[in-house]
C-alpha cells in the first residue's frame, strides 16, 4: 500500500512539474422522473481564506523520504441547471431535479501550487434515485445505477 502511494505521489510530482493542466471530470445525469441525490463524503480540511472547502483524499499529512506532503482535493461543481449543494460534516450533497445533470471536476494542490491531476479516489459515492447514470469523460466508462439507492466506491486514473 505504501509503495502504491509512493509511486502515485512520484507520478503526481512529475506531472505537476511538467505543467499538467488536463482537467478530469465526470457528469452525473438524471434519467428518471424523480430527483436524485448525490453525496460525496470526505474528511473536511480547514478552508483557506477566499477558497472553496477542502476535503482529504488520503490522510491529510504523510511522511515520506522526500518530506511532508499533502493529499488534498478541492471539489468544484458546475451545475447544468439548478442544483442544491449542501456541505455538512464533510459531505457534499447535490440534489438534481429531473432532466438535469451535474459536472464535477477536481483539482489538486501540492506545495502551494495548484495543478489539475489525473488520479483521484472518491471514498464514498451515494446516489438516490432510480435511473441515474454516471458518465466519465475521457475514460469511456459508464456506470448505471438502477437501484433506488446505494453506496459505491469509484476509482479512476
Question: What residues fall within each predicted segment?
Answer:
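Intrinsically disordered, low-complexity segments enriched in small/polar residues
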Residues: 20-31, 35-157
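Sec-dependent bacterial lipoprotein signal peptides
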Residues: 1-19
Amino acid at each position: 500500500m505504501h509503495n502504491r502511494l509512493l509511486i502515485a505521489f512520484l507520478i503526481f510530482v512529475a506531472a505537476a512539474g511538467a505543467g499538467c493542466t488536463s482537467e478530469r471530470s465526470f457528469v452525473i445525469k438524471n434519467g428518471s422522473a424523480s430527483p436524485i441525490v448525490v453525496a460525496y463524503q470526505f474528511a473536511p480540511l480547514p478552508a483557506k481564506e477566499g477558497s472553496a472547502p477542502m476535503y482529504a483524499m488520503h490522510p491529510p499529512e504523510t511522511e515520506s523520504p522526500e518530506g511532508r506532503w499533502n493529499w488534498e482535493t478541492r471539489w468544484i461543481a458546475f451545475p447544468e441547471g439548478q442544483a442544491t449543494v449542501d456541505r455538512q460534516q464533510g459531505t457534499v450533497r447535490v440534489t438534481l431535479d429531473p432532466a438535469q445533470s451535474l459536472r464535477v471536476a477536481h483539482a489538486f494542490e501540492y506545495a502551494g501550487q495548484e495543478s489539475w491531476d489525473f488520479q483521484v479516489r472518491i471514498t464514498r459515492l451515494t446516489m438516490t434515485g432510480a435511473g441515474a447514470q454516471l458518465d466519465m469523460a475521457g475514460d469511456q466508462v459508464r456506470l448505471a445505477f438502477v437501484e433506488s439507492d446505494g453506496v459505491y466506491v469509484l476509482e479512476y486514473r
